Amino acid sequence: MSQRKYFGTDGVRGEVGGPVINAAFALRLGYAAGRVLVRRNASRQGGRPQVLIGKDTRISGYMLESALEAGLSAAGIDVVLAGPIPTPGVAYLTRALRLVAGIVISASHNPYQDNGIKFFSAEGTKLPDEVEAEIEAALEQELGCVKSEDLGRARRMSDSQGRYIEFCKSTVPHSLDLHGMKLVVDAANGAAYHIAPHVFRELGAEVYAIGVSPDGFNINKGVGALHPESLAEEVKARGAHYGIALDGDADRLQMVDASGRIYNGDELLYAIVRDRMRQGKVEGVVGTLMTNYGFELAMGRLGVAFERANVGDRYVLEQLLARGWQFGGESSGHLLCLDCHTTGDGTIAALQVLAALHANKASLSDWIADLRLYPQVMINVPLQPGQDWKTHAGLAAARAGVEAELAGRGRVLIRASGTEPKLRLMVEAEDFALAQASAQKLADSLG
């Protein structure tokens, strides 16, 4: 794939008012994407192509939505405005309404000062690389406008949230009845603020909701999946059975039990996979380079194949599709259940966990008791300009020694930071002291 100027691994993202997240660029991006989609759907019957736009609750969403809408209309695309809705909700509605593409305006777990724009295909999956490349090329052309009779229209979709709520509920058996269960749901003042509490209430749970008062500036601020400690306190204070924390665009999940214990993505994925094993539905699972070694060992004990992808749910999805598997995720809480949805979905993942516990009459701590996560130690070492750590003899020797010592009892991961001149040295081992000593050996070898 050729070098991209604008698109990263998760669409276009940056600080509002910066080079790419501004009204002028969004207008151009809407027009460029619109021209590509019109050309690719020239033989489509039934009028102009339609594109869905959804967003989270950032103040900049209004500006970017209007600019994208104008650009798409100028290219001859009809626009459906879904309003605030989770990223996976855009994927679902794009597919359900047979639209040619979906657009999400969100920077996920980032603060309100950032925003992003990413695309879904008509199938509710990430836009193919070749289509992104065509949009990049179209961005280099002048902004134009189709003839007046070919301009696109825009309409607001009044029932987008209700449709998505029903879809979420449809992913669990009708026998799942949450009456008698008390939940705290934290929507991070983000896209799921109206949706997530309703999903669990309509299945019978008593729900106390936090992070459901967005003001355009408080998305992810001290709440949500990046701050599960506040949820843990709420769960204990209210005597709830579980807490559910989503991030700003609701594609990430963390959970808390009645004792205040926080469960990360590895633990929640294990809960889902173990239940699907009971149903005979698991061929393999994809994690990432950061997935805990204890999870890998647990998959081995279950007899489930396990593979690691690069960090990022996009890469997990690519491996799942390539292998024909259905389950994968990241420690951060991006969980994919492709038997339910085409993309990662925090609300649906939480439902799968609760359905597993309900079906097996188990608590979350008991259900994942066989999963033992290994202590992890990370040391960041500054890299000197021009220093090639891959050919550093001292580091290579230290790594060989550490890996020999840890054989079957841990692992080593060494990778350069993608944002700063640092080398990240990560060690997981049976006990913290061993992990810490091993990581320090690696760091000292670079001294």
Swiss-Prot record:
Named cofactor requirement(s): Mg(2+)
> Would you tell me the Gene Ontology cellular component terms?
cytosol
Q: Name one GO molecular function term.
A: phosphomannomutase activity
Give the Phosphoserine positions (modified residues).
S108
Binding residues for Mg(2+): S108, D247, D249, D251
Keyword presence, rRNA-binding: no
Cofactor annotation comment: Binds 1 Mg(2+) ion per subunit.
Q: Which InterPro entries match?
A: A-D-PHexomutase_a/b/a-I (IPR005844), A-D-PHexomutase_a/b/a-I/II/III (IPR016055), A-D-PHexomutase_a/b/a-II (IPR005845), A-D-PHexomutase_a/b/a-III (IPR005846), A-D-PHexomutase_C (IPR005843), A-D-PHexomutase_C_sf (IPR036900), A-D-PHexomutase_CS (IPR016066), Alpha-D-phosphohexomutase_SF (IPR005841)
Supply the alphabetized keyword list. Answer: Isomerase, Magnesium, Metal-binding, Phosphoprotein
In the record, the note on similarity to other proteins reads: Belongs to the phosphohexose mutase family.
The identity of this protein, by name, is Phosphoglucosamine mutase
> What is the name of the gene encoding this protein?
glmM
